[in-house]
């Protein structure tokens, strides 16, 4: 009994188990355990019904806009193209009326041509301004480049034009040496061994002293 009490008194008590937070335990349980996905509040049949209703409304709006355009076109034609009164007109009067109608048609064609020219000009200006904006922003579309085989002479000709031949003539800036001058120098130098023999010995020293 004494030994057991001594061993119990000498050994330290066991450390308590770490206490885990309730929030972390709940998070682990939620992450590990499978859970059902949240169901949508609207069923599939209800979604299909709403889509069908939206398509029907859009179709009705398009039909109404087309009917309004047809009505506007009819009103414009009725105001501009009045009905002809041909009752009681003679042959000469009918000819005059035809001439007036042809003149009016020609005038309308001229106006239509002018309007088309203005529209084309405006479209071109808009395209140019849009391209300038893209160039300033640095977002221009690069064209596709094709690989072309070209020689160095043709490339220099394309870049420099008439100056290509002048720039390629590299010997034009070099110093030209005449053949007669080189032969004269060779004659003056002569054989170098004879010069060494002439300057060696007492005679050579005498020549150096006298020179």
Curated annotation (Swiss-Prot):
GO terms for cellular component: troponin complex. GO terms for molecular function: actin binding. The modification N-acetylalanine is found at residue 2. Gene3D superfamilies: 1.20.5.350, 6.10.250.180. Residues 130-150 are annotated as: Involved in binding TNC and actin. Phosphorylated at Ser-23 and Ser-24 by PRKD1; phosphorylation reduces myofilament calcium sensitivity. Phosphorylated preferentially at Thr-32. Phosphorylation by STK4/MST1 alters its binding affinity to TNNC1 (cardiac Tn-C) and TNNT2 (cardiac Tn-T). Phosphorylated at Ser-43 and Ser-45 by PRKCE; phosphorylation increases myocardium contractile dysfunction. The record marks 81, 98 as: Involved in TNI-TNT interactions. Pfam families: Troponin (PF00992), Troponin-I_N (PF11636). Residues 33-80 are annotated as: Involved in binding TNC. The modification Phosphothreonine is found at residues 32, 52, 79, 130, 144, 182. Binds to actin and tropomyosin. Interacts with TRIM63. Interacts with STK4/MST1. Belongs to the troponin I family. This is Troponin I, cardiac muscle. It comes from Canis lupus familiaris (Dog).
């Amino acid at each position: 009994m004494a030994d057991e009490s001594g061993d119990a008194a000498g050994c330290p008590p066991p450390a308590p188990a770490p206490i885990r937070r309730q929030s972390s335990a709940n998070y682990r349980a939620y992450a590990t355990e499978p859970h059902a996905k949240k169901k949508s509040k609207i069923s599939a049949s209800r979604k299909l019904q709403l889509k069908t209703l939206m398509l029907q409304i859009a179709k009705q709006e398009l039909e109404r806009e087309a009917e309004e355009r047809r009505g506007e076109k009819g009103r414009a034609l009725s105001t501009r193209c009045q009905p002809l009164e041909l009752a009681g007109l003679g042959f000469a009067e009918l000819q005059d009326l035809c001439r007036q109608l042809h003149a009016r048609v020609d005038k309308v064609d001229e106006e239509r041509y002018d309007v088309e020219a203005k529209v084309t000009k405006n479209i071109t200006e808009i395209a140019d301004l849009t391209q300038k904006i893209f160039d300033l922003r640095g977002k221009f579309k690069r064209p596709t480049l094709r690989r072309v085989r070209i020689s160095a002479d043709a490339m220099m000709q394309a870049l420099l034009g008439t100056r290509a031949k002048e720039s390629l003539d590299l010997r034009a800036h070099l110093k030209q040496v005449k053949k007669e001058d080189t032969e004269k120098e060779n004659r003056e130098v002569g054989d170098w061994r004879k010069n060494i023999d002439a300057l060696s010995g007492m005679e050579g020293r005498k020549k150096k002293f006298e020179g």
